């Protein structure tokens, strides 16, 4: 036996779930993903999403509506008469006609332990807040923002130096297995739903460019969490005067270290930076237009000594 599934997703995070459901023998009757976007060096090429590309390799039909406001689009969705829709980082709002457009509704893979970190950036926000654990949850979608009842939960530890990129990759695999397990249980009519608690609700707002600059005037642990929560994308940054001009430098790795001194000033010649309390050592950096470099390699090209100001 197998389910007939409409899969809805867009980024690389969604791809392992699509592949695992297909490998499990479910009938993927349609794949919905966001439309191709301008890309390439000049932005002249239209680039298909990772899910779009994966679906084509699997020989699956792909649909790329801009939204579901058109009645014809909603009717096409319902016409598949699918058992269930699986949604993983699709990126479009789904109207009730779509949420109720399959026999068993829509099940979403969400990268947090709900109700903590509902919303667009749960991975980054969990690390930036210093959380020591997070997870993947399979929830049945309703018309609220990540408010539906939970079907399955898998907890994941967040290491003290783990970056958002590393956590993303871990949750991507955990989430795929969780969704595959949930679909087996759904097929067996053995997938009980548990309402989310009313307490502990936090919203994971989309990362704004204005919050990516590093404020060394904060506690060292907060600075470290800020850096790793934004690595590798969009990247936390500071400005450094190079050749008489301010240049933006991204920090893609850091660690807490012993030290105390002026906030935003290098305390040693190996990128130990003072904070309001304590210090952080910058371990991986990237200049504008350059490639990411380990601290030692960065310093070979841009020597910096104790007393240098980072702003």
UniProtKB/Swiss-Prot annotation:
<comment type="similarity">
    <text>Belongs to the Fmt family.</text>
</comment>
<dbReference type="InterPro" id="IPR001555">
    <property type="entry name" value="GART_AS"/>
</dbReference>
<comment type="function">
    <text>Attaches a formyl group to the free amino group of methionyl-tRNA(fMet). The formyl group appears to play a dual role in the initiator identity of N-formylmethionyl-tRNA by promoting its recognition by IF2 and preventing the misappropriation of this tRNA by the elongation apparatus.</text>
</comment>
<dbReference type="Pfam" id="PF02911">
    <property type="entry name" value="Formyl_trans_C"/>
</dbReference>
<keyword id="KW-0808">Transferase</keyword>
<dbReference type="InterPro" id="IPR041711">
    <property type="entry name" value="Met-tRNA-FMT_N"/>
</dbReference>
<protein>
    <recommendedName>
        <fullName>Methionyl-tRNA formyltransferase</fullName>
        <ecNumber>2.1.2.9</ecNumber>
    </recommendedName>
</protein>
<dbReference type="GO" id="GO:0005829">
    <property type="term" value="C:cytosol"/>
</dbReference>
<dbReference type="InterPro" id="IPR036477">
    <property type="entry name" value="Formyl_transf_N_sf"/>
</dbReference>
<dbReference type="Pfam" id="PF00551">
    <property type="entry name" value="Formyl_trans_N"/>
</dbReference>
<dbReference type="InterPro" id="IPR011034">
    <property type="entry name" value="Formyl_transferase-like_C_sf"/>
</dbReference>
<dbReference type="InterPro" id="IPR005794">
    <property type="entry name" value="Fmt"/>
</dbReference>
<dbReference type="InterPro" id="IPR044135">
    <property type="entry name" value="Met-tRNA-FMT_C"/>
</dbReference>
<dbReference type="GO" id="GO:0004479">
    <property type="term" value="F:methionyl-tRNA formyltransferase activity"/>
</dbReference>
<feature type="binding site">
    <location>
        <begin position="112"/>
        <end position="115"/>
    </location>
    <ligand>
        <name>(6S)-5,6,7,8-tetrahydrofolate</name>
    </ligand>
</feature>
<keyword id="KW-0648">Protein biosynthesis</keyword>
<dbReference type="InterPro" id="IPR002376">
    <property type="entry name" value="Formyl_transf_N"/>
</dbReference>
<dbReference type="InterPro" id="IPR005793">
    <property type="entry name" value="Formyl_trans_C"/>
</dbReference>
């Amino acid at each position: 036996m197998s389910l007939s599934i409409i899969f809805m997703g867009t980024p690389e995070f969604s791809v392992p779930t699509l592949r695992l459901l297909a490998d499990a023998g479910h009938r993927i009757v349609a794949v919905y993903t966001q439309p191709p976007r301008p890309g390439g060096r000049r932005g002249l090429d239209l680039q298909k999403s990772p899910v779009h590309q994966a679906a084509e390799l699997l020989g699956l039909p792909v649909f790329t509506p801009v939204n579901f406001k058109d009645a014809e689009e909603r009717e096409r969705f319902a016409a598949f008469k699918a058992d269930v829709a699986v949604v993983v980082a699709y990126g479009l709002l789904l109207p009730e006609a779509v949420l109720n457009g399959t026999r068993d509704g829509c099940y979403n893979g969400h990268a947090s332990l709900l109700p903590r970190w509902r919303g667009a950036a749960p991975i980054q926000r969990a690390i930036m807040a210093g959380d020591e654990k997070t997870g993947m949850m399979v929830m049945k979608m309703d018309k609220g923002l990540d408010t539906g009842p939970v079907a399955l939960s898998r907890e994941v530890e967040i290491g003290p130096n783990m970056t958002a990129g590393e956590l993303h990759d871990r949750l991507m695999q955990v989430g795929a297995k969780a969704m595959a397990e949930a679909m087996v249980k759904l097929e067996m009519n053995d997938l009980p739903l548990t309402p989310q608690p009313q307490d502990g609700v936090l919203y994971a707002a989309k990362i704004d460019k204005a919050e990516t600059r590093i404020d060394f005037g904060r506690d060292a642990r907060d600075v470290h969490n800020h850096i790793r929560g934004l690595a590798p994308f969009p990247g936390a940054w500071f400005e450094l005067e190079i050749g008489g001009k301010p240049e933006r430098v991204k920090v893609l790795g850091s660690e807490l270290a012993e030290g105390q001194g002026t906030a935003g000033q290098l305390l040693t010649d190996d990128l130990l930076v003072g904070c309001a309390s304590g210090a952080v050592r910058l371990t991986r950096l990237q200049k504008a237009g350059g490639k990411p470099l380990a601290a030692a390699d960065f310093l070979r090209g841009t020597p910096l000594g104790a007393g240098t100001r980072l702003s």
